[in-house]
Amino acid sequence: MIEKGIFKNTFSNLYDSYKEGKKGSGNASRTGSPMGRSSNPIPISAPHNITIKSGNTSQEDMIKDTKHGLLVGRLWYTYAVNPINGDFSCTARSGIQIIENGKITGPGKSVRIIHSLPNMLKNISSIGNDQRKVIQWASLPSITPSIKVENISVNSI
């Protein structure tokens, strides 16, 4: 999708790829049933089954290098607000920790994040040397390191 900061390709499934004469990226799921196990709906392309390459910064060092921020363990309810511009909205509602002067000072409250994906990608300041599986409902897991993003506005909910 993105390689060395350059946009290379979109999510695709075999159905859309065949229509466009391209190779599928393996990012398909079926909607309309629990656990995505119905064969009735047409597969849609979705952001899952993605691997983000590790960087060289530990999560501990990212925290030490943060004056004021949040450590977010999981995002919920991520929706495209304006798909053309890449604007999205999501909720961080569990596993939030407050970072002050390079130290975790306690748990945080749920917040709403409304941002632009292109701007968020420009504001990545470090990528962790760790890897973890992230599962979106019944999808195949994505594999991602810790990612530190600067200048994200959050609203309490």
Segments (PLM) and residue ranges:
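Dual-mode signal for accessory low-complexity, basic/Gly-rich regions
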Residues: M1-I157
